[in-house]
Amino acid sequence: MTATANDSRTLQFLGNNEITVLVSGSESGGKFSVMELVVQPRGGANALHTDHWVEVFHVIDGEAEWTLERDGSLDTWIARRGDTVVVPAGAKHRFAGAGDRPCRMITLGPPEYEQFFRALADAWQGPFDRERTPRAVGPVFERFGMRMVAA
């Protein structure tokens, strides 16, 4: 299988963050999706949330602040170039660009993962807003079996 680039592969989400589909769910025969995220400083998935699939993130440039539930408690740290973060299904997590330049990560998940980001890009075009963004993207989270949660 060889994936080729085209304009519909790059999406804007939660402001000026970008995700580029490298291998779509259909290109993998419905097995997985691979994407590149470009997360702006303090941008990203700022709301603590859970989902029902495993996600893998590999930092290829920059830094991201991660919060991830491990053994029932929340750990927060900075992931840097070369670090890989594995988010177990059902674990509370969030991430945001850290530092003063964008963070680039390769991420792997199921085909629904790509579909979620496409729906998220359609639902919210502006920067993250603590009051309005959750209301706008809440139905997208519900559709994909995800939940925004408290710490």
Give the ranges of each region predicted by the language model.
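Short acidic-glycine-tyrosine-enriched beta hairpin
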Residues: 70-92
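Acidic/histidine-enriched, glycine/proline-rich intrinsically disordered or flexible terminal extensions
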Residues: 119-151
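Short histidine-centered beta-strand/loop micro-motifs
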Residues: 23-24, 44-51, 68, 75-78, ...
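Glycine- and acidic-residue-biased ligand/ion/polar-headgroup-sensing regions
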Residues: 52-65, 69-70, 81
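Ligand-binding loop in jelly-roll beta-barrel domains
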Residues: 81, 89-114
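A short glycine-rich, His/Asp/Glu-containing loop-to-beta-strand
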Residues: 9-48, 53-54
